[in-house]
Design a protein with these regions (language model features):
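Exposed, low-structure sequence patches enriched in small/polar residues
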Residues: 2-213
Length: 213
């Protein structure tokens, strides 16, 4: 039924604020999003938002809904230098966070991320990011069973690319994902060499190496 669907799981045994009511033929609920931000050509931009989806919210034919029963708050702040300075043509830095609760008031997860990108005056390009997922609680992992606590993780990557307008250009990069309590480790390294003898022809060689444990 709709009450037992993956968007709700009203049958969860530890959810005292919701339950399956077999007499209902439809659900009622509400949802909304409020955003406040600054979007312009200025150096500093930001956005903060709150999204609410009550447990009984149902879109029906309006669109697909992955989940309900959530209160989400997120904020991002960006610093963007568009004009050349020092050795850079431009520079972009962004940091953000997300927090999720259910309608019982239980904090489900906290995520933070910082990322940057820049082009140098020699037209080389660099970007990277760092993401932290704190210890979190999932109401859906057991598909209708009780909530389960999941360990957090840290992810990061860095990429560098030479001038793409040249006939020969290259890129190197790496990714590292690490679960808390040594739950998992994943490391990947890659490089690429691209040769473009003419506009209609491009040849590339892109080996990679990964380690997982």
């Amino acid at each position: 039924t709709t009450q037992r669907s993956s968007a709700r799981y009203f049958q969860r045994p530890d959810a005292e604020y919701i339950s399956v009511d077999s007499s209902l033929t439809s659900l009622s609920g509400y949802g909304s999003t409020i955003k406040l931000g600054r979007y312009s050509q200025k150096k500093i931009q930001f956005e903060t938002s709150v999204t609410v989806r009550s447990p009984g919210l149902e879109f029906n034919d309006i669109g697909y809904m992955r989940y309900s029963d959530v209160i989400h708050h997120g904020t991002w702040v960006a610093y963007y230098l568009r004009d050349p300075f020092s050795i850079f043509n431009n520079f972009y830095l962004n940091t953000n966070y997300w927090m999720y609760w259910d309608f019982s008031g239980k904090l489900l997860s906290v995520l933070t991320n910082t990322n940057f990108s820049s082009q140098f005056k020699n037209r080389w390009f660099i970007n990277g990011n760092l993401t932290r997922v704190g210890k979190n609680t999932s109401n859906t992992f057991l598909r209708g069973g009780p909530s389960i606590k999941l360990t957090g993780s840290t992810e990061m990557n860095l990429n560098i690319q030479t001038d793409q307008s040249k006939k020969i250009y290259a890129n190197v990069g790496n990714y590292h994902g690490m679960g808390d309590q040594k739950r998992y480790r994943y490391h990947e390294y890659w490089m690429g060499i691209n040769f473009r003898p003419m506009n209609a022809l491009s040849v590339s060689f892109e080996p990679s190496y990964s380690i997982q444990n």
